[in-house]
Amino acid sequence: MENEEPVLSAPDVQVVDPDVRAHVYSLVTALGGFNGEDADKYVLGDDALACLRDIKRWLKLYDEKHNRMDVARCLGEANLVNGDLLPILAVWANSKKQTKYMSRIALACLELLVPLTWPVELHGELTINHHRHIPYIQHVHVSYKRGLLSHASTSYLRTIIRVGIPSMAIPRSERTTRDEGILKLLLYLLRNIALITPNTRLAAEGDEEETSRSATINAFQDQDVFALLLTMCSNVGDDFTMQDVALLEILFHLIRGVSVEKLFMDDAQRTAKRTDELDDLLRQESSLRREYAKNAPTRHGRFGTMIWVKRDDAKYSTVSGQNVLKDGQATLQKMDETKKWNKPLIRRKPQDLTVHNDFSTPVHLNSTASNNLRMFVEEFLDSGFNPLLTHVRKAIEREADRVMDINTRQFLYTTAWFLEAERARRARQRKKHAESEKPAKELEPDSFGLVAGVLNQETFVFLNRAMQYALDNKDWEDLNAGMRCFTQILLTVQDMAQSPLEEDQEIAENIQNRIFYEETTHDRVLAVIRGYKDQPFGYLDACTELTHVFLRMLERYSKENLDMQVRSRRRARRKAKDVEGTGNDENDEENGSEDEDRLEAERVSKERKFDFRRFAAKFCNQKCVDTFVAFTKHYKELNTEQLKRAHRYFYRIAFKQELSVLLFRLDIINLFYRMIKGPGALDSSKPIFKEWEEFVRQIIRRLTKRLDQRPALFVELLFSKINATTFYLEYGHERQTVTRARKAPAELEIDPRQAHTIEEKISIMVPALVLDGEEDLVTWVSDVLESAVEEREAWETQEKALRDAGAENSKIPNPMISVKARDDACQQAMFSNAKLRLLMTLVKFERLGAEDVPGAAWIIPSAPRAQDLREMKSFIDKYFEKAKRGTLGRDPRELIRRKYGGGKTASDNQHNPDIQFGDDSEGEDEVPDGPLFPPNPRAAPNPANKPTKKKKRKERNPDDEDEDDSVDEETLEERRRARLENSRARLAKIKSDLYVHASDEDTDEEGDKEFFLLEEQRRREQAKRIKHALLTGMTEDGDGSTNKKGQRKRQTTRNRTGEAKSKRQRRGKQADEVDEDDDVVMGNMDAPSPMSDREGTPSGEEDDGFNFDDDLVFSRDREKLLGSAGNEEKDSNRPDKAMAQDEDDDDAPIVAANRRRMRAGFVVDSDSE
């Protein structure tokens, strides 16, 4: 053995410590062996169980403790597994009498098999000892797997399962820690067997097929491993809770790299597929040979040729070969071929090599293994998919101890693979049913409930969090698995939307609402495609597929839902107040921490209308184009679906978004040209070739046209396009942008119930500005008032002097005082700070002009006297000092609110309901408050027959002439506004009887009974009248009179009935039109009184027979009103009164039934409903 060890540095180098080797070999020898008399029978040693435990102790205390692999190598050299452990298991399995001692030995063998087959991962913390032993350990693992899978005499896997069956049979509540450990060992051994693969860097021994994936799958099927996995997976959460992660790992290593498309093919389709693949490889090989033959040396080129080429810079270059004598172009081509590009090395962050978790490398299965795996996959989808993956997701979310970082990647890939398998199985079933000659019955649609465990909101949240974490930490393999999972979820939802079951269609609609509603999902897809740099091809394939599927489904969904809304989350920062260093160091530290808290970014959410064209334009940039160009460069290895994916993206860029200039770069044009014309062109027999050929022809045609129009594009062909010049290069002129004037902030007001006088309002506004950190603005307002007081006092003094001198024009005009901003920031705050504007309004500042635009001039009018201005300044200074001392009770900002919009009448509300929808533009999407219903009609407060008492006006004292009238005016104005506010608050609580009736109770059984009795009576009377008309040829008359007045009355009644009928038809049509629009909510409409229909319709037997649309449900409520309206009802029987009332009905608005508002598929319930 020692002579076979490689010599590393010197002949006397010892790979393993001789003492360790001697101890391990002695234990293996004492374990037992084959008897000389019966060479086929293994005989255990006298103390075999103790030997097995000692070997386990050596592995644990030497290798694991010292981070070495010496004992594992010695056991591999001693052939412990194939020479001792497996024969011992065979003896235990074939013995007729099962003893407790042999069961312990079998369990000890299982305890050794797990660490001996444990996979070896390469990472950055490997030592020299590891690098010395890892190749040998990997080689020995393959031999262990070969011995476990071979079952010429004994099915070792079935025997190992027998070791764990007693623990499985015990109920979960009665299992001990030992039972759980046995099940864990059993599953870990199966995981190791599925994971072990031959090392491609080691020399092949010719028997790799015995340890291939196909052999593993066939052995699992033959030795009942699949049955064990199905049993445990279907009972995860009930009988097995701690085994979910191990089961997930087994499934992952069984299916990783397996093509779902080939798995669900039958033998004929699989053979045809492999034939096509072989034909493609042969065609590529012949193409390479033809390209090589063009420049290959010939048998006649025996004499060498060397020439000098004089270049433009007077330098000479040497070129050899006879083919350079053809022409100058061939010479330059030869020079280019001799150039060598030293590609710079890319410094990457060292990452661990996850050899055993690579799912991008394809794995080929034979026919038997494909059939066995397909049967297992179908049974797993039917019984174990939902329980296992739901339980694993919950374990990963709560970060259970048994969960490793790699399990998230395995979960996402396994979910994606089985979702694709479910879609492939359904497609296969539909195809087989369509191809069957005699379909017995129509194929019953199957629900997607089998995979519903990964289509819920919890899974979407977990997937989004995992993808964002992988993107932030640049963990590309985890992000690759997340993108595959997200893509398969989208494709599964797409199939659900096309399902014949209405339940699946509704679920698919709801899932799409949830996915596309979050703008963070849109941004993440965009960041992934734009952030590609030099990741492996599997990552490139996943991100391009996700972009293709996401854009296609989002475009279709946005077309079907025109009022689609998305929730955007932006980062908003609250302005921190300036902290003045007036305190000690501790206070400074506290204030500094408060400022940091205020400066922390907050996520604010807002709904806005979605515009797909605007979103698709975000993918029209050079980074996204470079990603798809890097993907298209592998066009020789791409299949038809992948080529179609790249073609659709470039077509969207060039023709849908009209940004073909992004493709006008030399390397991109050269790539397109080589794909069609060669060398190494696409196979012209492929169906996608025609589409690519037409696309490249149109692109080159546009390029030549643009070059003729804009010669500057010749230079731009060498570089990537930037946003500043893209529009000009595409359209020949700069983008015409229209600057939109900034909108003034919403006008604020102070709650009239909390403040009535100017001082009370200033006591609210000044602390509010101080709390917002705007002390400088308060100081500025105080300074402006101070200067205004001085100027106004000077004018008043001058006016008094002129009046005392007895001048004729003693009253000179009081000049207005201009309000000047201190700096640009103050000027900006005068327009954008709503609280400052309210304070300025309170202290009698006024804005000049009707337009409220930035930079508008503010003045102090001539009405306020110096005394008034001084008083307001004193109020500001007083409450400014209180606010700085912090002696405030309630937060004054809570007393400030948006001001109600005035000037709107009821008619305006009727014809122009104030409805606002979200838009892509930034701004505040706030719906102004207002009463839900118009006020109830009130009786006249002063009837005409009741005399009113005149109020005695208080006589004014002539001594109070000097008192200013403006104060009384302000007090009255404040009281009027307080009354208006109380009225609005009262109206907001009113639900008018015009809209809410007693019949709104759905459980009124007496009303329903009365309604149906009246309907039955009307039908009987109608049947009698029809029968009488058929027998006699005449209709019944209510009164039987034949005079002209009665004829005119009946004629008028018929006309009125026809008009009423047509009126009802028009009303019904309008109501239907309103019902068709889900987004329009009609409010503030004056409805006709409940008596309007009866008042406009004459009473009589004829009308009782034909007016079927009378609202009989409300009859009980209306009977109360019949007594008071009896005179009016008598008058309404006259033709002129009836016609007049019909005309009034035409003008009355129609109140549509209140519908639940929906936005992008979500029901928005009002609080009052």
From Swiss-Prot:
KW Oxidoreductase (keyword) present: no
Transmembrane segment boundaries: none
Compositional bias of kind Acidic residues: 583-599, 917-928, 958-972, 1100-1112
Primary localization: nucleus
Biased composition (Basic and acidic residues): 973-1000, 1009-1024, 1113-1140
GO biological process, one term: replication fork arrest
One Gene Ontology term, aspect cellular component: replication fork protection complex
Localisation: Nucleus
Keyword entries, A-Z: Cell cycle, DNA damage, DNA repair, DNA replication inhibitor, Meiosis, Nucleus
Record's keyword annotation contains DNA repair: yes
Leader sequence segment: none
InterPro entries: Timeless, Timeless_N
Highest taxon, organism lineage: Eukaryota
GO molecular function annotations of the record: DNA binding
Record function comment: Involved in chromosome segregation during meiosis and DNA damage repair.
Family assignment from sequence similarity: Belongs to the timeless family.
Name of the protein described by the UniProt record: Topoisomerase 1-associated factor 1
